[in-house]
A protein has these predicted regions:
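Catalytic nucleophile loop of clan PA
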Residues: 64-65, 177-198
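C-terminal cap/linker of serine protease catalytic domains
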Residues: 27-35, 99, 117-123, 194-247
């Protein structure tokens, strides 16, 4: 079997290419998180009179701008609450502005809220959305939001898989998602596009970065229907189940 040996000059050249490639990856990740600053928002929700299964109080989460002409921001339904609530939104280093609920789907845990485009800061931008492809296992991602009130911060990880164990179909990721991250973007670190909405983490004391995000492909379908003036709400059946038969 013939063995090839790199000449010293060629070896140095290969090392330089690898070093340059690594630096480009680092710079790209930094730019992607920097871009997230301009479309991610902080959301404060105040609930005084909650519906059943909701709670009264003040809650915080994240969201991101998806339609700058309409002023639409995407987040989780549990961030803004299905109960009557006061929802306020702030871009980075900006003051809070009152937001209006446009659409809420508790099954998908999806909400679309709206603020006036006049309230946008000059450096705002609309998030690029991945509306067609599902990321494969191993795809590098970044979660962005406000974990434990550490505002506008990011974490990194990979896509661990896609699961339907939670009722709906979710992306599973080991990128840390904590309280305050809910509703924020899960971003592809290859393309810079938002591929999901950070939604939850596995509720177990032994959990080590088993976290979940709503697939952006479903969110894009809802946005498309809303832009067309159609109601994207799932159909409702007018009956209920009883745990015990009537006597």
């Amino acid at each position: 079997m013939r063995r090839l040996k790199l000449k010293p000059k060629l070896l140095i050249c290969c090392l330089m290419v690898n070093l340059l490639s690594s630096s480009n990856v680092i710079a790209n990740d930094e730019q992607i998180f920097e871009d997230a600053n301009s479309y991610t928002v902080e959301i404060i929700t105040r609930v005084e009179i909650p519906f059943k299964e909701d709670e009264a109080g003040v809650f915080s989460g994240a969201g991101f701008l998806v339609d700058q002409e309409r002023g639409w921001i995407v987040t989780n339904a549990h961030v803004v609450s299905k109960s009557p609530s006061k929802v306020e939104v702030a871009f980075k280093d900006q003051e809070l502005h009152l937001a209006k609920k446009i659409y809420l789907d508790s099954y998908l845990d999806l909400a679309i809220i709206q603020i006036s485009p006049e309230k946008f800061p000059k450096n705002h931008r609309q998030a690029d959305l991945e509306c067609n492809d599902r990321p494969k296992t191993g795809h590098p991602v970044g979660a962005y939001g406000h974990p434990w009130d550490f505002s506008f911060t990011g974490t990194k990880g990979i896509i661990s898989g896609i699961t339907s164990e939670l009722g709906s179909e979710y992306l599973q990721t080991d990128a840390p998602i904590n309280s305050g991250n809910s509703g924020g973007p899960l971003i592809s670190l290859r393309t810079g596009k938002v591929i999901g909405i950070n939604t939850s983490s596995y509720d177990d004391d032994d959990n080590q970065n088993t976290n979940f995000a709503e697939l952006m492909v479903y969110v894009c379908r809802v946005l498309k229907l809303l832009r067309e003036g159609k109601d994207p709400s799932p159909p409702k059946l007018s009956f209920t189940y009883l745990e015990e038969p009537l006597k």
